[in-house]
Amino acid sequence: MFTTRTGTQRVDLIRSSLQENGVHSSAHLIGRISRGEMVRVRRGVYLPTQAWAEAPPWARYRIAICAAAMTQDLIFCRDSALVLHGIPLLSTPPAIFARTANPGEAKTHAPPQMTGRVPLQQFLRRYSESHPEAAPLRTAHLSNFPTKRLEPARPKNISRPEHRAQLRSGTFSIPEVRLTSGALEAVAGPAQGYRAEPLGLAALDAASRMSFTEAVVVLDAVKARDDAAPVPWLPYLGTKRQQAHWRRAWGFADAGAESALESESRVVLAQISCPAPTLQKVVRTSIGDFRMDFCWERERVAGEVDGRAKYFEPQYTNGADPAEVHYREKRRREALEAEGWQLVRWGKAELRNRQELVKRLGRAGLRPIST
């Protein structure tokens, strides 16, 4: 039901409205909620239950951003702005982040109950009855994202009261850019598009509050872009801790990383004292040239971080089935070994079980010294 990294069709959210016959569609949509067929993402914005249930968490987050934009004129910031700018995140954020010039609105706003007035267990039962072929719907599937409204970011040399006065007088306006309605791959956006903070400000404001690994995932991607320009926003880093955290993460970031898993791998490799690898090196073999995620030329070791997508998602497999992909990978490994390279593979499990990663690298001749 949605355009994702798997190439399936985008979600189209349904907005309740007054019909040509003078009847408002909300009554019909609420009736579909009562039968377990629809969920309410935001007030007046609906989606077929099965589409929401089958969407992965990252896609649900994007659907919620779109629904929020359809119902309120929001300027998205921090993690939400990064998503709109196409920057990967290590994990799905817990809330939608948006600015407000009204201090009274600067708080977390609970989302609507996705099942409307229908009790949750009753909704689950009705969905199961109307979708016997679908995977079971669970309570966790019906968790929605709140909207966290934040006062505008400000330079550290301007106090909050001064900044509020500037907003009231019109001498300062919230920084923003306009993004197209197609900014989110998971969902067809509102016709007017989205309002979001500039990428440089969003990256700086979000990354300075993230863990080091989360920040590197963001900043690797930001460094690969030519439209980020975070330097003009450096005065917006409010505390010395944020400034130090930003400098460390920005200094470590590398535009050569091409996925969140590669960025996370770079952090873990550094933490286990592995020699710094070369990123995206092209290795020539008898059957062709291969670009490797990580290379250690002196040790003749190549590293590849594999997610499930590499074997199952069409944009990576070019339509081949998993067995064919595995066969290609076998030939690739053999060709690399014939040129004197050892290939080490790892995925999410090994990044979270560092002892296993250390063993794999050690067997290939690398000597990380800590776990």
Predicted features and spans:
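Surface segments flanking catalytic/ligand-binding clefts of nucleic-acid enzymes
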Residues: 2, 6, 23-24, 223-371
